[in-house]
Amino acid sequence: MVSSKLSFVATAVAALAPLASAFDASSRSNLAIYWGQGPNQLRLSHFCQETSLDIINIGFINYFPDMSPGHWPGSNFGNQCDGSVYVTNDGVVTKLLSGCHQIMEDIPICQAAGKKVLLSIGGAYPPDQSILSEDSAVAFATFLWGAFGPVAEGWEGPRPFGDVVVDGFDFDIEHNGGFGYATMANTFRQYFNQVPERKFYLSAAPQCIIPDAQLSDAIFNAAFDFIWIQYYNTAACSAKSFIDTSLGTFNFDAWVTVLKASASKDAKLYVGLPASETAANQGYYLTPDEVESLVSTYMDRYPDTFGGIMLWEATASENNQIDGAPYADHMKDILLHCDPSPPVTSSSAIPSSTPVTTPSPSSSAVPSSTPAVSETPSPSSSAVPSSTPVASSTPVVPGTSASSSPVSSSSAVASSTPVVPGTSASSSPVSSSSAVASSTPVVPGTSTSPSTPVIPGTSASSSPVSSSSAVASSTPVVPGTSASSSPVSSSSAVASSTPVVPGTSASSSPVSSSSAVASSTPVVPGTSVPSSTPAIPGGSSSSSEAVASSTPLVTLTLTVSPTPAPSSSESSSTDLSSSTQTDVGTAPSQPAGPSTTATATTSSSSSSTDESSTTVGSGNGNGSGSTTTTAATDSITAAPTATSSATATGATSEPVTITTIIVTSYIDICPTGFTTVTTTYTTTYCPGTNTATATATVTNPPSGPGGAGSQTTAPTVPEGWTTTVTICTQCAAKPTTVTLTLPVTETGSTSTDAVPAPPAATGEGSNPTQPSGASPTGGNGSFSEEPVPPPAVTQVSTSTEIVTLVRPTSSRPLILGTGTVHPSSTLAVKPSAKPSGQNSGSSSHVPIPPSYTQEAVSPLSTGAASRVTGLGHGLVLTVLTLSAFFVL
């Protein structure tokens, strides 16, 4: 199956090359467009299948290192990422998105179609973007080259798009003067020169006023390839003034003169236009007929300088259909009509297929003292029509393998190891000198339950677990096509239960033992649920039909008994309600003393539309105009969710108390809209008297593609929490009634967002006021913090059992290629200020989840759009991530 997928995708990608013309940077009829900030925007691959586009600017890298946590840049690509970000070794949560699988998949499709993809720096938000020193400028460029340029052997920093390489960088600087950008551009040029076999490009998007306050210095002192002027923000020089001279003077002629006297004298000059009437302020939009008059005039007047048209932005063009074609198509037709020597294309048909990379499976255990990630690329792909949203748990980052470290203890240890392989999964052998129970529920690869961790491009296997006492191991497996459980051997009684819900097929491996063995394998294909009978009387195993729900719960039950548990096992899938799926695994063991039964009950679900976060509202298509609400709810209820329980049965020598540390999040309102706050609190209780709980639910979820969501109401408000109803005026385009569940007091709680910041950036020229066009000097850079080792692993004593359950939850629709948060890791990147492609410090390439549970970032940057009206912020309400740590 893997080889056939590889063959199919290789054929599909190869077919793209002859169907699209080769990119010609010297052409006068190129069409550039911005993408990444459109409301409810389609995937990048959709626009790459449009033959009208030649250059696509992905926006934005919008947080600059001198003003950003950890001195890392940050990014925002609208709805195309899952919200996960990188965290440094110092524990600093950065703003650099790590879960942008769709973009990583789609860029190669664009490049195969002959299009150039540039990464845009800037945008209109946040307004504090600036560079404080020459060293900071060099280090900023070095970081971006290491993270998004060609894969360098010495680079130890993040790779948000994996091994995918962008074709260059765009500067859309909107704030705080032009200091440092010439240095950045010249640093990029030095890196470009180190890769002579590939052509990279630099572009800039100044306002039409001369000189532009932000980019004139960079254009004059560094060589850019493309200059697309925003002819829609300033009335005095806008493109509309070419049509109506009473508005001002269209100054394309003046810009040609400026370029000829600068380091960018060979740059192509583009006319920047809004792609619809709503993409900029009123009065700046030009009809196709008006554009044709302008293009024919200046293409004929400056045939060596005129480069084409730039549009803000892709979604606005897509929504502006004229005679059945998007605005971009009309612009391309105009350019080709006016160009006396247009480029030759062999065909206009581009297959609309979207490959999804699939890593090769791994069936061997890889013992390691820490989680290890190694780069061994072996990508494969499968085609999925881009016109239909498809939810998939297929890993999308090729070439990594992960392994969990071995666990050894003299006391009972419960281990849960999610495994998400590309096409197959295998659990590691579990051996013990005492009783061993193993339960391995298998969930199909097509499942989109929000409880399924997505580990991009990982062939994963768990390492052996050995113990001198009882060992309970639960290994949820999410395979692409098939799943199998590994042998379980023991010198004592062994009970094994493997409920399997396969995508295509499932098989159970042999279970061997020198004593009695109980084994049952209920297979649940689709929604038809058979039941099975275990080999040993006294136990039972059954499965009932599982129905998805929008209320995920996580429950851990520990039962302590003074007498040995019966030598039988029970595994069942229980219908909690008419719309809830429950996976239950019970693993009894028989140590010499009192037995311990660990029962992990996980209720996870997804609605019929596979939603995984609740969208309260979305920004409009203008990137800067007034916000319009397209999916707002009149009433929203949010509350924290975390459930834990423990019971003690039988006589014990001393009372049993349980200390529970609950880490939970709740939704609050800040001056800009919704915000997610993470809090931690501790409670100690006797299982026989009460339990520690924190429950939550979201009521009245919005309707999705499959219909309205079912309404669920929480039975009670958790102790220590209170419910409040308020009117939020900044959460959507219209006032919205919001029901919030908030903690009564924050006393004793710790916010996980409060992390110590590393040392501030160093370097000369702090906060300069005058721009400088000096070339980089190769200083030491602004990232000066020293590498910090990963946090120490929690030590488990012989009298303590620790079970950790992490269940990311949300109710927003999953998009093909995205997933939930990633496994934990640590990163520390200190790029060198010297353009050598090397980086000091160490980091892991595996992103970790953010401290907030953001599922798909909303557009925050307006970039090359109008700067007069308010920003168009899409609002996303996300439900909670629960991390409960139970200590007995």
Curated annotation (Swiss-Prot):
Q: Which residues form the signal peptide?
A: 1-22
Activity regulation, per record: The cyclic peptide natural product argifin acts as a specific inhibitor.
Name the keywords, alphabetized.
Carbohydrate metabolism, Cell membrane, Cell wall, Chitin degradation, Chitin-binding, Glycoprotein, Glycosidase, GPI-anchor, Hydrolase, Lipoprotein, Membrane, Polysaccharide degradation, Secreted, Signal
Note the pro-peptide positions.
864-888
Q: What is this protein called?
A: Endochitinase A1
Q: Where is this region: Disordered?
A: 338-631, 743-799, 813-855
Q: What is its EC number?
A: 3.2.1.14
GO function terms (MF aspect): chitin binding; chitinase activity; endochitinase activity
Question: Which family is this protein grouped under?
Answer: Belongs to the glycosyl hydrolase 18 family. Chitinase class III subfamily.
Compositionally biased tracts (Low complexity): 344-617
Q: What class of enzyme is it?
A: hydrolase
**What's this protein's function?**
GPI-anchored chitinase involved in the degradation of chitin, a component of the cell walls of fungi and exoskeletal elements of some animals (including worms and arthropods). Required to reshape the cell wall at the sites where cell wall remodeling and/or cell wall maturation actively take place such as sites of conidia formation.
Q: Which residues are glycosylated?
A: N622, N780
The listed locations are:
Cell membrane; Secreted, Cell wall
Q: How does it sit in the membrane?
A: Lipid-anchor; GPI-anchor
Q: Which organism is it from?
A: Aspergillus fumigatus (strain ATCC MYA-4609 / CBS 101355 / FGSC A1100 / Af293)
Cross-referenced Gene3D superfamilies: Glycosidases
Catalytic residues of the enzyme: E174
Question: Lineage of the native species?
Answer: Eukaryota, Fungi, Dikarya, Ascomycota, Pezizomycotina
UniProt domain GH18: residue ranges: 29-338
